[in-house]
Amino acid sequence: MNTVSSWIAIAAVVTAPLGAAAAQAPDGAIERAVAAWAKVRTLRGTFEQTVTNSLTGTSAKSKGEYVQERPNRMAIRFAAPMTDAIIADGKVVWVYLPSSAPGQVTKRPATDRSAVPIDLAGEFLDAPRTKYDITPAAARTVDGHQARGFVLVPKKGVAAPFTKATVWIDEDDSLIREFEIDEPSGVIRHIHLTSVEVNAPVDRKAFNFPIPKGVKIVDQTKP
């Protein structure tokens, strides 16, 4: 299982009567989202996740908490009965997934963002028009917030942990409220951020990962 990872895009609903005004709308939306994310230093809240495997026809739901301190600290902890956790402490990324890989914890370089991005929205907000092909998605209401939908597909040559992503951005504060990613394995991962708190104080202890007793460390930080 990969981490909560995924993010933002830009599109327009173009109709003949609207002409050029419609074509300009997505630029404003993405710029507002980029500007809003630039002001975020910390992020914390709760999430719900649904993972669907099209090959097996199964799905699983889970929930948990996340804490992020940009640029390189992240803690994602799943709620009981799961004990899975993904912790980026600023130096390495610890991936502990006993629900799918029992008895081990993987230690990855903090620079390895291919499978475990450590920036909740940076994957989408870093030059999105350059990196992704964009199309519109249906808007929806997320926890009482009107949210615009966008689809992005990585352009040829762009490395990304997904083949397609759909995101919903709050029309009021331009923050991501919900997103869905299609992974190369065929898994579809839907994330609903049930609460979002921006720039609140965070305890650095949240980014500590005490290694569980008896687990094997798979060290991928060495060549």
List each model region and its residues:
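Bacterial N-terminal signal peptides that target proteins for export
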Residues: 1-11
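N-terminal leader/targeting segments and the immediate start of mature chains
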Residues: 11, 19-61, 73, 211-223
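Extracytoplasmic/secreted envelope proteins and their assembly/folding machinery
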Residues: 27-37, 90, 118-121, 166, ...
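Extracytoplasmic
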Residues: 40-42, 61-63, 69-71, 81, ...
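A generic structural motif
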Residues: 48-54, 77-79, 96-98, 153-155, ...
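An acidic-aromatic
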Residues: 65-117, 189-192
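Flexible, surface-exposed loop/linker segments and immediately adjacent secondary-structure boundaries
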Residues: 101-146
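Gly/Pro-enriched, hydrophobic low-complexity segments
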Residues: 130-214, 219
